[in-house]
Design a protein with these regions (language model features):
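Outer-membrane beta-barrel signature, preferentially recognizing the C-terminal barrel domain
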Residues: 1-18, 47, 125-126, 132, ...
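Residues on the lipid-exposed face of transmembrane beta-strands in outer-membrane beta-barrel proteins
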Residues: 11-15, 54-60, 94-100, 135-139, ...
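Outer-membrane beta-barrel proteins
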Residues: 33-39, 77-83, 118-122, 156-162, ...
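Extracellular loop and loop/strand-boundary signature of outer-membrane beta-barrel proteins
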Residues: 1, 38-46, 57, 79-86, ...
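Outer-membrane beta-barrel pore domains and translocons
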Residues: 27-33, 73-77, 112-116, 152-154, ...
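Conserved C-terminal beta-signal and adjacent last beta-strands/turns
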Residues: 149, 243, 268-379
């Protein structure tokens, strides 16, 4: 058996009206994740990851109609396996974002700089910095109908190796290892009718260069930039409200491809079947009680597995599934200070395997019927 423990400490401050600064939000945090496993003569899979970080986010109003957001982010990580073979990584970033109100058009512009440094268990070191711009536009054609579009660039620094497996492997990095760099373009719309009907939709196209991968070279495992990922998809949602009744429905689909093949790698994107969501709920005034039902239905998805843990077949078809949940939320005082929540997830005890796992046909099933009762009190 194994024991997984997570210890989190977070100190947060919120304030405002400090001269030019209208809003301020800052926090420092510590996260320690540890895995202890019963000793085995063939292997040791103990591991620990320590993370420290801080964030400072500021908002300033300009001319009573525009908003300027800016701040600093910092994080450092250290992982070890059985107390040895340490890996280290640090990330720091600064950003500025402007939200410009030129009614009926809202323009959003942003610029972010990220710097990272990493040291592997075999003492190979890499570091780099990236500048990422972004721009977005919302056009309110009428008070009820708007269209939007955006183009965003972002980077993700190389990740540390799995702490539990690090003790038995020599991990090095390619001398020219770079951060993954993504470009995401999106277009969408929002429509509201008479405070009853809401429709929204979007289409996106994403490209990620320098996808991080690992290969074996002799006695070493080498981090390197392994390819390019392309992903495109859409999402449509509808909601209708009448008195206390709310009905929802939606569909989402995406199609990732890595170098022309569908990706099955945990570090990139997971191919999932077209997903349909539904919901029906009713809100009573007295007592203050909401009851409802949620449904999630995923169509089957086929792909060619290319990563460890995948089925050996050349093509795998993940079966579709449907899951239903019921829930109730009661506020005895009629306010938000006291909440009693009851839910039954997977109410029909469906045996299914999710598409979000990177493994192929041999992935683990999701939990069966899950009954939960919770009471929350705020003061």
């Amino acid at each position: 058996y194994r024991t997984l423990t997570q210890d989190t400490t977070n100190l947060e401050f919120k304030g405002g009206n400090l001269g030019f600064i209208d809003k301020i939000k800052a926090n420092v945090y510590r996260l320690n994740t540890k895995r202890d496993e019963v000793p085995n003569p063939n292997y040791e899979l103990d591991g620990e990851v320590r993370t420290y970080g801080a964030n400072l986010n500021l908002d300033s109003r300009l001319f009573d109609r525009h908003t300027l957001k800016y701040g600093v982010n910092w994080r450092t990580q250290k992982s070890s396996s059985n107390g040895e073979n340490n890996e280290k990584k640090s990330d720091a970033g600064v950003y500025v974002e402007g939200i410009w109100d030129f009614s009926p058009v809202t323009l959003t512009t942003g610029l972010r700089y990220d710097r990272w440094k990493m040291k592997t268990s075999s003492n190979t070191e890499n570091s780099d910095g990236n500048l990422n711009p972004s721009i977005g536009l919302v056009y309110d054609i009428t008070p009820d109908f708007s269209i939007n579009t955006s183009l965003n660039y972002a980077t993700r620094s190389p990740r540390l190796y799995e702490a539990a497996l690090m003790s038995s492997r020599s991990i090095i990095s390619s001398p020219d290892l770079k951060a993954e760099r993504s470009r995401n373009a999106e277009i969408g719309f929002n429509y509201h009718w008479n405070s009853a009907l809401t429709l929204s939709g979007s289409y996106f196209h994403q490209q990620i260069k320098d996808v991080q991968a690992i290969r074996q070279a002799g006695q070493n495992y080498v981090w390197f930039n392994g390819g390019k990922l392309k992903n495109r998809g859409y999402e449509l949602n509808a909601a209708y409200r009448w008195k206390g009744l709310t009905a929802r429905a939606g569909v989402a689909y995406s199609k990732p491809k890595l170098n022309g093949d569908t990706a099955d790698i945990v570090t990139t994107a997971i191919p999932m079947g077209r997903t349909w969501t539904t919901g029906l709920s009713y809100q009573f005034d007295n007592p203050n009680l909401e009851i409802g039902w949620r449904g999630r239905y995923v169509q089957n998805a086929g792909y060619a597995p290319t990563s460890r843990g995948s089925d050996v077949a050349l093509n795998v078809v993940r079966a579709g599934y449907g899951v239903n949940d019921i829930f109730a939320n009661w506020k005895p005082t009629g306010k938000d200070d006291l909440n009693v929540n009851f839910s039954v997830n997977n109410v029909f005890d469906k045996n299914y395997k999710p598409h979000s796992q990177r493994a192929g046909a041999n992935s683990l099933p999701e939990p069966g019927r899950d009954v939960r009762l919770s009471v929350n009190y705020r003061f």
